[in-house]
Amino acid sequence: IRDGEAVLAGVQFKQAKTSQPCKPTQPGDHGVKLVTGFDLNKGLPKLIEAITAQCAHVAERQSRERTAVLLLSRRNEPLRTIQAQLDRKLPVKAYTIHRAKGLQAEVAIIVDDCAPVQPHPLRNALYAYSGFFRNSYDQAMADESLRLGYVAITRGVSRVFWYTRKAQGATERLSRRG
C-alpha cells in the first residue's frame, strides 16, 4: 500500500487519500520489488521460473485468495507471449491493468513500464485553448500513467514484482524510495 501511495504522490491533480491494510503482514511479504533491465524476449524463461516459484509460495502459505498470481501488463501482447509459455495448470490469471481494476491476488507480477506518452504540443494547445482543463494534456497523461501504476501495485495482497526495461514513470518513483 505504501508503495502505491508513493507512486500517487507524483500525481499533480488528485484527491488525497490514504489506505489501511486489512490483513497483517506475514513473513516473506513485501511491497514492490522492482526488476529493471528486463527484456521479455530474452528474459522470458526466468520470468516463467519466477511465476512458477510465486505459485509455489502461495500454495505453501495456504492463502484464501481466489487467485494465487495476477499477471498484469498495460497491453495484451506481452500477456499472450507469457501465457503461451506458462503451464496452464498454474493458478495464474493474466489481465491488462485496466481490466484488473477491482481484482486482487496474493501475488501481483507486473510486466510493463507505465511510462507517460511523449509530449504532444497540439493537444497541449487544445487543452489550454478550451479552458476546460486545469492542466496540460501532457500533465494529464503523466498523472494517468501514475494512477495506472497505483492500480497495478495494489492488486497484490502480499507481494508485488514489477519487471520493466527501464525505471521511468511509476517505476522511476519506486526506484527512488531507497
Describe every region a protein language model picked out.
Residues 1-4, 47, 51, 145, ...:
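Structural preference for long, well-ordered alpha-helical segments in enzyme cores
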Residues 1, 79-81, 103-104, 117-122, ...:
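Switch/connector loops and helix/strand junctions flanking conserved nucleotide-binding motifs
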Residues 9-14, 54, 58, 178:
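Helicase-associated low-complexity regulatory tails and linkers flanking the ATPase motor
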Residues 29-30, 90, 104-107, 156-159:
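Short glycine-/polar-rich loops that comprise or flank the Walker A/P-loop
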Residues 1-29:
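Conserved coupling/interface region of RecA-like P-loop/ASCE motor cores
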Residues 118-178:
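C-terminal accessory regions
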Residues 36-117:
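Conserved helicase/translocase motor-coupling segment
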